[in-house]
Amino acid sequence: MRFRAFVLFLKALRAYDRARLRLRMRLQPGLHIHPDASSNFAAARFSLEPGATLRIGPGAVTERRRGALRFDLRAGATVEVGERVWLRTDGGELHIAAFEGASIEIGADGFLNGATLSAKRRVRLGRHTFVGLGSRVFDSDQHDFDAERPEQAAPVEIGDHVWIAADTTVLRGVSIGDHSVVGTRSLVTRDVAAHTLAYGSPATARASVGDRSRTR
């Protein structure tokens, strides 16, 4: 009897969250959440300026932690969350920020764990790519260095089947090739070739990596 009551409670909670998501999408025309995405996205915080677009694909999931997942999109920005992406928040807050006119793309089957993505131009993550707990990806300096040296920005491209381990920072203009691994607490300031293990501060190539297409 108690189990049946619990199941009914969960069904009612999901229906409530679905209704909240439908209301949010009506109030924010740029917000598009696929009906097959998790109803837990109702617990996320969405801030979209006029002209911004956020799309969350089918099968995408997150935890039901109020405010632990935040999307901040300035005017004209676009964010695409692919099919079956897991935006995990039970280990820490996850923040995705796209500034004016910038874009962020998270490929299908990706996994982000309490991470930060920040784009002033473009940040792209390929299919089946993992970003570990506390890691950060920035495509800009974030601030001017001084009066003579203004902030610079350059797109970040992260390939398919890449694993960026915990507490790692990826800086502007970096390209990380397919099937590569970046070790924990690394600072990535230059390109990492495909099938490469890199770590350190700054991260440098240390070994080769095989096929990661079937990893979990």
Regions found by a protein language model. Give the residues of each.
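Solenoidal tandem-repeat scaffolds enriched in leucines and small polar residues
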Residues: 154-157
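Gly/Ser/Thr-rich helix-start
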Residues: 166, 184, 201
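Short beta-to-alpha loop/turn elements within the nucleotide-binding domains of ABC transporters
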Residues: 174, 186, 192
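Short-chain dehydrogenase/reductase
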Residues: 181, 187, 197-199
